Amino acid sequence: MDIGKFTEKSQQALAEAQNIAVRFGHQEVDAEHLADALVRQEQGLVPRLLDRMGQKPEAFAEALERELGKRPAVSGPGAAPGQIFVSKRLNAVLVKAQDFARQLKDEYVSVEHIFCVLLEEPASTIMGRIAREFSLSREKVLGVLEDVRGSQRVTSANPEDTYEALQKYGRDLVEEARKGKLDPVIGRDAEIRRVIRILSRRTKNNPVLIGEAGVGKTAIVEGLAHRILKGDVPEGLKERGLFALDMGALIAGAKYRGEFEERLKAVLKEVEKSEGRIIMFIDELHTIVGAGKTDGAMDASNLLKPMLARGELHCIGATTLDEYRKYIEKDPALERRFQPVLVDEPTIEDAISILRGLKERFEVHHGVRISDSAIVEAVTLSHRYITDRQLPDKAIDLIDEAAALIRTEIDSLPADLDEANRKIMQLEIEREALRRETDVASRERLERLENELADLRAEQTALLSQWEREKGSIDHVRSIKEDIERTRHAIEEAERAYDLNRAAELKYSRLLELERQLESAEKGGHDETRLLKEEVRPDDIAEIVARWTGIPVTRLLESEREKLLRLADVLHERVVGQEEAVDAVSEAVLRARAGLSDPSRPIGSFIFLGPTGVGKTELCKTLAEALFDTEENIVRLDMSEYMEKHAVARLIGAPPGYVGYDEGGQLTEAVRRKPYSVVLFDEVEKAHPDVFNTLLQILDDGRLTDSHGRTVDFRNTIIIMTSNIGSPYMLDGISEGGEFLSGVREKVMEELRRHFRPEFLNRVDETVLFKPLLPAQIARIVELLLGRLRGRLAERKIDIRLGDVARDFIAKAAYDPVYGARPLRRYLQHNIETPLARKLIAGELRDGTTVEVDVVDDALSFRIE
């Protein structure tokens, strides 16, 4: 007997039979041990055959083990442990199994051959008796085996991989639609009709759905499955099966060369045998190119081509545009066998309709309500702010995550109840400490504490019962909704089966009753102040968007009008003496937000011109804080680093083949991470002229393509470029009242035009001239800087006061029109912060004191109160 002629599963069963014999303490392996091993085999064929015959494999195995337990067991010293022998009877069974395999023209002895021989054991044996008890016979097994195996012969050591290949390596989408496992498909009628038209063709009847990730390619195929189920398809497609092929399952575990091809051929043979009744769906179609390819082996695409060419295989593919170009178009023979169907991103209106159709599924799954305004908000916010993903996928994700957020809040302790629990624990610890004390004050405190604890416990009990009541109410609503969904599914099934009496009974009796129950359950419990939130509202959607994109949620929900009307005031608080600049920036932002400027361009683009230290960069920081709540949302690029021609590549990333290609560009990566920011190009005149060619498409279209081909969205950024061009004209051409003399602006603009090309300057919204600061404005800046110092000293409760004389003295001493306000910070550091630090360390200045700063003998003096 050649053990090499037994399949892998047969060999595993023989090894397991030996283990069973050892476990029972038997001295030889008999037919019953092998039968037990076959019936208990994981993913084995015998349990599947028993299931098909209506017998439970577990019951059969238990009956065998009961009888095996009655046999005499041998223990103690003697033969080497585990050394047992094959009985003469089992040997005969295996020889008969070999003969039976030859009779069926199979090359290997498989588990079904052994099982059929075991069932023919005489009634005097345990095996024969149990087989008759369970009404099992060789003929019955062969009848079921024919359904599973078909006309296939055992020609390899792993024949089970090729049995029922479609069930094993695919999902029947029509069957899943029948069971209600697929989500409803709303819209996409044009694409589904196009797929149906292609499937109805005589040749090249294989559509491939091509579109960006998340636009709903798989949903179109699920929509087709729904239509096939309802019979809403042409005659040629009615009663068709639609199987989604799982390439991962096909490849997984294929250890030896040829094993993958064998599995795929088994799938294709089943499809071929169906004579066009089965349509195969391959998601991620590009995976078939190169799948299973090893030295000398064929990949999946080459196995599919002949059947696709002959029209024996009806196949629907789905893949993205990039992968179609990269894999399918490279193989023209494969490409011409498929007919492309382009799937575009749905419009905002269509995406809202899709989400409305899915709303009920999400409500039932999460057990919460989803308001219609939340659906509209999810689509509009995702379209506006999540630019690197596609509708409807990104909007569905928003709704799903917001509903999950509400559900987790329902399942966890409410904040009020959690706070009450913590207070009770804190007071109980305090009570235990006070019980050890004997003085009168401690006794009084203990008495007060007991009363407080009693009140808190009463509050906790009330809150707990309210929470449980509300949670029970929400769960009750959820169970009613689940019943409604099951009833609707049952109505659809009854209508498909033309069981009109049952359909009418369910529709006009059971469904109406459930809807009445739902209405009364949703009405109840709304009068009291609720602990739990059970509805997804627009603010929940905004909160999720804020988490994903980093935009503060308060800013997102605050009305645009309020935010923009306050913008000029907020900027004036921190930027002193630059009314024209502040007004120009705030007005440009107002125009952009009011929709009077092109929405495809950035919020605003400005060139700030002026001498050093007049507030150009400070205005950028203030603008970032006012619009985006934080100074951190500023992308700052020092243009003196981009003086060489090749440095331009650093903005958008190195081209393919160059070092640093994978790292991305400094500008594009920064804006991709923070799409809502102020982009500051500092000292812009120092950059190479080619940099401005890159900026042209940002200023005009609000977008920039990086070296990887990804489009970065600049529509929600404010572009600011600072420069010192024309500073000498501005310093010399200022009047005593702080206004520019006539002709100064023209000279500065002329200088600017000499530096930059007209097509660049023409795209900038506003060129703003910053005036040199006057002494009066310097005094205000002194107050601003001292305000920041007060903030640092506030932690120690130290206050600092500055008289008018001292303020004017500092302004006069530190002011230099050439350097602007920057010398002020240095002056305050040397003449106020350093002396105060000395006094703090020496112990002269203590917490809670006030420092008066005055001028004595042309120097600052400090008086501590």
UniProtKB/Swiss-Prot annotation:
GO molecular function, one term: ATP binding
Residue ranges, annotated region (C-terminal): 773-865
Protein name listed in UniProt: Chaperone protein ClpB
Domain notes for this protein: The Clp repeat (R) domain probably functions as a substrate-discriminating domain, recruiting aggregated proteins to the ClpB hexamer and/or stabilizing bound proteins. The NBD2 domain is responsible for oligomerization, whereas the NBD1 domain stabilizes the hexamer probably in an ATP-dependent manner. The movement of the coiled-coil domain is essential for ClpB ability to rescue proteins from an aggregated state, probably by pulling apart large aggregated proteins, which are bound between the coiled-coils motifs of adjacent ClpB subunits in the functional hexamer.
Organism this protein belongs to: Nitratidesulfovibrio vulgaris (strain ATCC 29579 / DSM 644 / CCUG 34227 / NCIMB 8303 / VKM B-1760 / Hildenborough)
Domain of life per record: Bacteria
General function of this protein: Part of a stress-induced multi-chaperone system, it is involved in the recovery of the cell from heat-induced damage, in cooperation with DnaK, DnaJ and GrpE. Acts before DnaK, in the processing of protein aggregates. Protein binding stimulates the ATPase activity; ATP hydrolysis unfolds the denatured protein aggregates, which probably helps expose new hydrophobic binding sites on the surface of ClpB-bound aggregates, contributing to the solubilization and refolding of denatured protein aggregates by DnaK.
Residue numbers binding ATP 2: G610, P611, T612, G613, V614, G615, K616, T617
Region (Linker): 346-550
Family that this chain belongs to: Belongs to the ClpA/ClpB family.
Keywords linked to the UniProt accession: ATP-binding, Chaperone, Coiled coil, Cytoplasm, Nucleotide-binding, Repeat, Stress response
GO biological process: cellular response to heat; protein refolding
Gene3D superfamilies, per the entry: 1.10.8.60, Clp, N-terminal domain, P-loop containing nucleotide triphosphate hydrolases
